[in-house]
């Protein structure tokens, strides 16, 4: 088993929970028949210990041990604050 954590970047789509955020990770996949590249989105719950993230922020998250039923990611850093 690898010792390195999986790191992803995404946008915060919800910050209403205490010490938790929901991050949308966007990726492109090639359609198996037509060959066109399509955007696909995955939503993951991440741990935000200090409640530093806001809605629309671009963040970097890393995979960790399961923290709850749905949380297996933790916030590494905020890459870009949302323009309000």
UniProtKB/Swiss-Prot annotation:
Keywords of this entry: Ribonucleoprotein, Ribosomal protein, RNA-binding, rRNA-binding
CDD domains linked: Ribosomal_uS17 (cd00364)
GO cellular component, one term: cytosolic small ribosomal subunit
Molecular functions (GO terms): rRNA binding; structural constituent of ribosome
Gene Ontology biological-process annotations: translation
Domain of life, source organism: Bacteria
A Pfam family hit: Ribosomal_S17
Matches recorded under PANTHER family: 40S RIBOSOMAL PROTEIN S11 FAMILY MEMBER (PTHR10744), SMALL RIBOSOMAL SUBUNIT PROTEIN US17M (PTHR10744:SF1)
Subunit structure, interactors included: Part of the 30S ribosomal subunit.
Family to which this protein belongs: Belongs to the universal ribosomal protein uS17 family.
Reported function: One of the primary rRNA binding proteins, it binds specifically to the 5'-end of 16S ribosomal RNA.
Protein name: Small ribosomal subunit protein uS17
Species whose genome carries this gene: Vibrio atlanticus (strain LGP32)
Name of the gene encoding the protein in the UniProt record: rpsQ
């Amino acid at each position: 088993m690898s010792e390195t954590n999986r790191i992803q970047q995404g946008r915060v789509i919800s910050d209403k929970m205490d010490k938790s955020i929901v991050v949308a990770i966007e990726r492109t996949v090639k359609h198996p028949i037509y060959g066109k590249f399509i955007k696909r989105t995955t939503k993951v719950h991440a741990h935000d210990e200090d409640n530093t993230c806001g809605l629309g922020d671009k963040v970097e998250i890393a995979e960790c041990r399961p923290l709850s039923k749905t949380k297996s990611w933790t916030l590494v850093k905020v890459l870009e604050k949302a323009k309000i």
